[in-house]
Amino acid sequence: MNTDPCVHCGFCLPTCASYRVLGTEMDSPRGRIHALKAIEAGELQLDATVAKHFDSCLGCLACVTACPSGVRYDQLIEATRPKLNAPELRTPVERAFRKLLFALLPYPNRLRAALTPLRAYAGTPLQALARRSGLLRLLGPQLEAMEQLLPPLAPEAFREAFPQVVPAQGERRARVGLVLGCVQRLFDPAVNEAAVEVLSANGIEVVIPPSQGCCGAATHHQGELAQTRELATDLMASFAGVGPLDAVLVAASGCGHTLKAYGSILESPSAAGFAGQVADIQQFLAELGLSETFRAHLAPLNHPDGTPASAERPLQVAFHDACHMLHGQGIREQPRQLLAAIPHIQLREAMEAGVCCGSAGIYNLVQPEEAAELGRIKAADLAGTGAELVASANIGCSLQLRRHLGEGDFPQPVLHPIELLQRSWRAGRA
């Protein structure tokens, strides 16, 4: 691991989410790099106490963007994560909880089976009563955090909704594969529905292998290398034999960041070739361009009070920059370009757009207190824009934002930008 470029200037500190809420040098990129140097020199032991300072890192990569010396902290923390999974560095409870998460989250069919009994609970008055009663605290902070993120479960989450090939409407402009994501297809299936509809309406044929599973993002971000490689290999295999594709698209930035890293994860030319085809759906649509037919049918969206947006009263939308999109993939302008195509939308920028919301894969489950504080900070920042709704292009962020925006007096809806395009397109065809 090359820690030499770090000159300990401290430019990373104001951008670091863990340093913001914990306030200690060891919980900052600079402090962790100093610790890595000491470990490498034999001056410091990687024990359970030191490991906690690495575990406090969200992996948001804001420090990489901020660093004037080009320190690849992302590579340093990724190389360190597998070492943190040594049994002696975690308590039995921590190991058991992580084992549960990694046995469920990356496997859509298992997760669907686990969620089935909760369909009569999630999003109902019973759930609201349980939350108000304080009884959920008896579950412990980690299980309580899981419950706090549990959204209403749509019927579409419990069936495979798409054919293997969705044809392009009109002249075909491109042919793409679509990665559905494991958490997204269950907790927010409307996003994938919108993605398929918007792509097809723009003359893009969509291929959706029914056998596809998890891309490995959750395990990748936690250093579970063997499981990540297995999941990545299986996902690539599900796209084998589907024919030539112009791109492999994904509508969740956390997944996209991992998919684009398949070359280094699997260390093979075929994986690098697959990764080279991966694009965020917004990145792809912005670069290809919305079709003239699609643009012609985009209509104003409604305000929360039901009245349509207008030039005199535009719909105020705050765009949330997910860390693995902004810092991990360098995507910032493309989502804003797509949203600007909708008539009478006015984008409101958050004051601290580059600061993590606290979701960070499974961070808000394994580090619930720190994640909740970051969630409250981000919710206050977005609410302070005066926006009527929030656009978020990552499922983990969306769940986190809905939880913490919902704690306010005037909670804003959180929707994927592709859902807003779909709604505008439908309104123009009504």
Q: Regions from the language model: what does each represent?
A:
Residues 1-4:
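Generic start-of-chain signal for non-secretory N-termini
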Residues 19, 39-43, 262, 326:
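Alpha-helix C-capping/helix-to-loop hinge sites
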Residues 28, 47, 104-108:
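Polar helix-capping/helix-linker motif
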Residues 37-52, 159-172:
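Active-site-flanking structural segment that lines cofactor/substrate pockets
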Residues 21-24, 41-44, 290:
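Short, flexible helix-adjacent loops and helix caps
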Residues 73-430:
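Iron-sulfur cluster-binding electron-transfer modules in prokaryotic oxidoreductases
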Residues 7, 11-36, 51, 56-83, ...:
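Iron-sulfur cluster-binding cysteine motifs and their immediate structural context
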